[in-house]
Amino acid sequence: MRAFEFWDTSPDQPDWRARLLQPLGMLYAQATAWRIAQKPGVRYGVPVICIGNLNAGGTGKTPTVIALVERLAARGITPHVVSRGYGGRLSGPLTVLPRQHSADQVGDEPLLLAAFCQVHVARDRGLGVELAVRAGAEVVLLDDGFQNPGVHKDLSIVVVNARKGFGNGLCLPAGPLREPVSAGLARADLVISIGSASDQSCFRQNWAAVLSQPYADKNATFQRDSVLPVLCGVMTPLQTGMDWSGERVMAFAGIGDPEKFFETLRALGADVVQQESLQDHQPLTPRLMRRLAQKAQQSGAQMVTTEKDAVRLPPGFRDQVLTLPVRLNLENWSVIDSAVDRLFENLDTRS
């Protein structure tokens, strides 16, 4: 989905275009609330951890899912991911097979995640969870299903880009939100805010009022009446042995925040002589790649992109483009570790 600049204005001073579209945003919020309230989510016999967001578009969910997969696996727990498969044409339910499926079939995010654990794509999330359980999942990570009411969530994590926060605080199309912040956080168990220390400080300052109010925990995971836990995380480049210092690069990215990717390259010492921001999930057609390759050649630069974009590269260009992988580092895993422990305790109690 295309993001508009006026979505990122201060929530205290929305742009005139946002104010003009605000009645439509209110209708969107009402429709979301109605859909969520229609029926209770179905339980499938294993804990379900939802990783979602309030904003439309990318906020760092995929790196968060990867971090959770690795954390759970390190504890001896077998996680499977269930995804809608945004950008793919197959409706599922199916298990992603990296050597057989392509991004245009199952979506770029499921194809990337399949390198870390079993991933199941299903337009009907419930059918996807059923498939995961039959395949041996001990816990299911529901990728981007926070506003989907069909599956019961035992733990709901809202991911937010600390730099952008919740934008102007308004719902689509007046702002970037799928639902009002207060309504979404009332169903969340914790928030993961991703960004630099300065971005984290600005996020907490701009959204202090809504983050500091107490929320009743409807899922009874934390049994808390305190404020919502907010965990801080930062994206760090994965050490691959590549020395980026002085490397002339033509960087392109079709993710939620391409500028963050370009900044990471510069921080590593790369000379970003050309950069191109693409739409999130934008198809990397041969025509587009030929144009980017020509720009790189004219600049004497090496093409480089993100892991998520790399899985969408046409076969003829895969050996021409370098990839810079990043991973999410959380400052404190103890809150999530304790929550996971309680999930399995609650499961034992129900059974």
What does each of the following model-derived ranges do?
Residues 2-48:
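A transmembrane-helix-recognition feature enriched in membrane-embedded lipid enzymes
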